[in-house]
Amino acid sequence: MQAFKKLTSSAIPLWLSDIDTDMIIPANFLTQTTKDGYGKSLFHNLKEKDSSFVFNNPDYSNSEILIAGDNFGCGSSREHAVWALTQAGIKVIIAPSFSDIFFNNAAKNGLLLISLDKDTVKELCDKAEDPKFSMTIDLQEQTVSADGSIYSFDYDPFRKDCLIRGLDDMTYLIEHLDIIKQFEQSQRG
């Protein structure tokens, strides 16, 4: 997993609520046996239906931040949705709320999800309609800076530490293997 500390990027405005995992990556693209190759299918059905869909706009092709509406990532628990987003270059999603399962899948795969109040998210989304608008995400300080304003966000301290150091669950366990072995030995008596 790639470490994340600070990011400055333009943002993709997607002011839709209840974006479910099937919208993010349709089920017919889940036939692979590897974790790779999902990014090209991100929002496939929405891109096909609407040529003006924001993910069809080349002005946002290098954007690493996505701004969305309430309840992002709802629906099934497919981890493929997170893989598709990260493989498409998305490193941060800002929304008023996220599905719990999606939130956990994102944290385990290095995708930073930031919840801000709905009015703030809508304001940022409106500003992101200009592809030149950029913002800075500072995970260490837990701030979003945009257009002269700074917004603070909460983030789980354990997940924050793992993301800053680039540790997925397995790497974290390996890093603490000696402590785990000592504990196991002490339990055996």
Swiss-Prot record:
The pathway that the record names for this protein is: Amino-acid biosynthesis; L-leucine biosynthesis; L-leucine from 3-methyl-2-oxobutanoate: step 2/4
> Its GO biological process terms?
L-leucine biosynthetic process
Instruction: List the GO terms this entry assigns under cellular component, sorted alphabetically.
Output: 3-isopropylmalate dehydratase complex
A molecular function (GO) held by this record is: 3-isopropylmalate dehydratase activity
InterPro entries annotated for this entry?
A: 3-IsopropMal_deHydase_ssu, Aconitase/3IPM_dehydase_swvl, AconitaseA/IPMdHydase_ssu_swvl, IPMI_Swivel, LeuD
Q: Which PANTHER family match?
A: 3-ISOPROPYLMALATE DEHYDRATASE SMALL SUBUNIT, 3-ISOPROPYLMALATE DEHYDRATASE SMALL SUBUNIT 2-RELATED-RELATED
Protein's name according to its UniProt entry: 3-isopropylmalate dehydratase small subunit
- Gene, per the UniProt record: leuD
Q: What does this protein do?
A: Catalyzes the isomerization between 2-isopropylmalate and 3-isopropylmalate, via the formation of 2-isopropylmaleate.
Which class of enzymes does this protein belong to? lyase
Which keywords are on file for this protein?
Amino-acid biosynthesis, Branched-chain amino acid biosynthesis, Leucine biosynthesis, Lyase
Q: Does the keyword Hydrolase apply?
A: no
Subunit record text: Heterodimer of LeuC and LeuD.
- The EC number(s) attached to this protein equal 4.2.1.33
For this protein's source organism, the top of the classification is: Bacteria, Pseudomonadati, Pseudomonadota, Gammaproteobacteria, Thiotrichales
What family does the database annotate?
Belongs to the LeuD family. LeuD type 1 subfamily.
Say which species the protein is native to.
Answer: Francisella tularensis subsp. holarctica (strain LVS)
Q: Which reaction does it catalyse?
A: (2R,3S)-3-isopropylmalate = (2S)-2-isopropylmalate
Q: What CDD domains does this protein's entry cite?
A: IPMI_Swivel
